[in-house]
Amino acid sequence: MAKFTQHTGLVVPLDAANVDTDAIIPKQFLQKVTRTGFGKHLFNDWRFLDDAGQQPNPEFVLNKPRYKGASILLARENFGCGSSREHAPWALTDYGFRVVIAPSFADIFYGNSLNNQLLPVKLSEQDVETLFQLVAANEGIEFEVDLENQTVKAGGKSYPFDIDSFRRHCMINGLDSIGLTLQHEADISRYEAQQPAFLN
């Protein structure tokens, strides 16, 4: 997986709490098990006025020209709630998002995001509200998210965030479960070499 140390990007505000995984990627689009191709269906029922996804909803925030190319999503509490589907972070990353900032996340979504190099950043409700106001008042504003130093820099201020040290290590080094295992390849080989022949 790609390493994540620091990211600077345009921010789009999704001013809604309790955004569930069915809103992020509706169930009718979950027929694939590969990670690509889901971005075009991200927030499908909100982005489009028709079932075929041909008529963009001009009122939905992702369709507004000022947020085109955004790579940081600013959201409200309990983002990613609902059913467990790894397709949700797949859709967000395939669309182009690298970071989601919110006061809280559903636990399963939070873990799935970290496993797929999408950084979920938890900030206080007060800090998130400040950031919403900042984005509304400054068209084209970018945030700098520094995973190594665990800070979000925006509007001349720095907002610290917490993340599990193991998860942080994996993201910074681009390690998934296979990559973590391969870090111990030499130890595994030595162990296997010590096994009795009848076990091989």
Swiss-Prot record:
Record text on subunit structure and interactions: Heterodimer of LeuC and LeuD.
Reaction(s) catalysed (UniProt annotation): (2R,3S)-3-isopropylmalate = (2S)-2-isopropylmalate
Entries under SUPFAM superfamilies matching the protein: LeuD/IlvD-like (SSF52016)
A Pfam family matched in the record: Aconitase_C
Enzyme class, first EC level, given as a word: lyase
Annotated GO biological process: L-leucine biosynthetic process
Record flagged with keyword Ribonucleoprotein: no
InterPro entries attached to this UniProt entry: 3-IsopropMal_deHydase_ssu, Aconitase/3IPM_dehydase_swvl, AconitaseA/IPMdHydase_ssu_swvl, IPMI_Swivel, LeuD
One GO CC term, this protein: 3-isopropylmalate dehydratase complex
HAMAP family noted in UniProt: LeuD_type1
A single GO molecular function term of this UniProt record: 3-isopropylmalate dehydratase activity
Assigned keywords, A-Z: Amino-acid biosynthesis, Branched-chain amino acid biosynthesis, Leucine biosynthesis, Lyase
Keyword Nucleus attributed: no
Name of the encoding gene: leuD
Lineage: Bacteria, Pseudomonadati, Pseudomonadota, Gammaproteobacteria, Enterobacterales
Assigned protein family: Belongs to the LeuD family. LeuD type 1 subfamily.
Protein's pathway: Amino-acid biosynthesis; L-leucine biosynthesis; L-leucine from 3-methyl-2-oxobutanoate: step 2/4
EC number: 4.2.1.33
The protein's role, per its UniProt record: Catalyzes the isomerization between 2-isopropylmalate and 3-isopropylmalate, via the formation of 2-isopropylmaleate.
Organism: Serratia proteamaculans (strain 568)
Protein name, as recorded: 3-isopropylmalate dehydratase small subunit
